[in-house]
Amino acid sequence: MAIPANFLRACHVCPLKKPAGCCKEQTMNIVDQQTFRDAMSCMGAAVNIITTDGPAGRAGFTASAVCSVTDTPPTLLVCLNRGASVWPVFNENRTLCVNTLSAGQEPLSNLFGGKTPMELRFAAARWQTGVTGCPQLEEALVSFDCRISQVVSVGTHDILFCAIEAIHRHATPYGLVWFDRSYHALMRPAC
């Protein structure tokens, strides 16, 4: 979890039997944005297309900021920039589907990661409707159909905590990860 700038004072605990105030408060160094982004490029992550459909309409975007939170109840999180054009749609619909891509689906990832109109994004693949009403990619490695249970804002992003209502796995796909600012196929079956 990212720590807001106004909380960046290091906590201090004095050793037992030392007088109060024996330790000095220290301020943590803040890493600049480019250094942070360069370091994050070293963390490989699954490539996902996040979709929604509901009262606010249909939308989707590419994301790698997705991870498991807990298995009791099954919950994952998705990070979404509040400045993104799709943010109002996800914010109103309160449902989403995390579609984890397989190797070979890089063009679809690029399409959903750009400025392509929504109808053209969705026309580029085959979709089913999940239990929440969200589009579920037929050829996804795995799809997690979810309801947004909680939203926490940190910096420029909202962290969407998503209660999983259904999971669909593809039979024998190969995985796709984003690492060092490029796509990489996993060389053996992922499921």
UniProtKB/Swiss-Prot annotation:
Record keyword Oxidoreductase present: yes
Keywords for this protein: Flavoprotein, FMN, NAD, Oxidoreductase
Full protein name: FMN reductase (NADH) RutF
Induction of synthesis: Up-regulated by the nitrogen regulatory protein C (NtrC also called GlnG) and repressed by RutR.
Recorded family membership: Belongs to the non-flavoprotein flavin reductase family. RutF subfamily.
GO MF entries: FMN binding; FMN reductase (NADH) activity; FMN reductase [NAD(P)H] activity; riboflavin reductase (NADPH) activity
EC number(s) reported in the record: 1.5.1.42
Purpose: Catalyzes the reduction of FMN to FMNH2 which is used to reduce pyrimidine by RutA via the Rut pathway.
InterPro entries cross-referenced by the UniProt entry: Flavin_Rdtase-like_dom (IPR002563), NADH-dep_flavin_reductase (IPR050268), RutF (IPR019917), Split_barrel_FMN-bd (IPR012349)
UniProt source species: Escherichia coli O1:K1 / APEC
Classification via SUPFAM superfamilies: FMN-binding split barrel
HAMAP family xrefs: RutF
Catalytic activity: FMNH2 + NAD(+) = FMN + NADH + 2 H(+)
One Pfam family recorded for the sequence: Flavin_Reduct
Gene3D superfamilies: Electron Transport, Fmn-binding Protein, Chain A
Nuclease keyword on record: no
Record-level GO BP terms: nitrogen utilization; uracil catabolic process
Enzyme class: oxidoreductase
